[in-house]
Amino acid sequence: MNTIAPDHYKTESGLQVWDVTRYMSGNMAQAFQYVYRAGRKGNEAEDLRKAVAFLEDWVAHPDVPRAVLPEGIEPTDGPSVGGCLLLDIPDGSQWKVQPLMQIISADSYEGEAMNGQPFCGRRLITNETLPRLKKRIAELGGVDG
């Protein structure tokens, strides 16, 4: 283990969480990291509660800028690296894949959803991601749910 890049943030193929989060906004990067490491270090429910707090703060502050990508970095770069990172998630943690992809999408995409309606990342997080994480916390014996 390297203290700068601990094992609970790495995959067996060598990808690290920061390969996905480096261009994300602060709250969303923190939420992604806590969901990713949940069950890999310490108390899973506690990590998920921290992720929920960061997501709720992000939803509550629409005035804060979303991910800002430097010139030459495409919006699809983070999600494609994210997809590769998520391929390495072990079978017992597959429940994480959808919330992690939703966090990436909500932070990095603006435009239309597949149904032609405007895409709203905050609605996605509020209606799908947060309930899913709170349900998982409740399943672990936490109080959320």
Language-model segments: residues:
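Intrinsically disordered, low-complexity regulatory regions
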Residues: M1-G145
